[in-house]
Amino acid sequence: YLRGTKNSLYEGGIRMPFIVKYPKKIKPGRVNNSSVLCAVDLYPTLCSVAGIKTEKNYKGDGQNYAKVLLGKSEAKRKTDLMWDFGRNKHFGFPGNPYDRSPHLAIRSGKWKLLVNGDGSDAQLYDMELDKFEKNNIAGEHPELVAKLSKKVCEWYAQNKDKGLQTDL
């Protein structure tokens, strides 16, 4: 089974099935385990499948994967996916230490890096060869780890919750 549980950024914590039924358009029983889709992809994809144009000035982060849903191609992401799993003293750690991930992750092509916001506990996995995330190869690719760590840590710094802003 996949490593991780809910409350972790390993695949067992972030992957979920996506089941689509569209008679006469999508062949029943088809399974695609290689394409990486995310919630941000739903809007442009479902609009395309339904024949609806997105707004003229739409600038969402999602990609259109209509061809994947219709079984016409596999998908390669054009952009990286990034996750932050916030934690505090009351919430956020799976019971099994093996399933406790760093709080940031980035998926870039076949690579997945997990790391903490301070750069500690970097874990790199080749998702084409190691979908169960058993072989941390961060030590074999220090330049890639540095590049992806910088990218996800900068993303986190720009997007993290600043807390409630009030004049009171």
Language-model features: locations:
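C-terminal cap/loop subdomain of S1 sulfatases and analogous C-terminal strand-loop tails that border
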Residues: 3-9, 26-35, 40-127, 158-159
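Ligand-binding/active-site lining segments
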Residues: 12
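Catalytic cores of eukaryotic secretory-pathway lumenal/extracellular enzymes that build
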Residues: 15-16
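Short beta-strand-to-turn element immediately C-terminal to the catalytic PLP-Schiff-base lysine
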Residues: 19-21
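Bilobed periplasmic-binding protein-like "clamshell/Venus-flytrap" ligand-binding domains
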Residues: 76, 149, 154-166
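Intrinsically disordered, low-complexity polar regions and short flexible loop motifs
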Residues: 130
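Active-site-proximal N-terminal segment of extracellular/periplasmic enzymes that hydrolyze or transfer
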Residues: 135-143
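Short amphipathic alpha-helical coupling segments at ligand-binding clamshell hinges
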Residues: 144-148
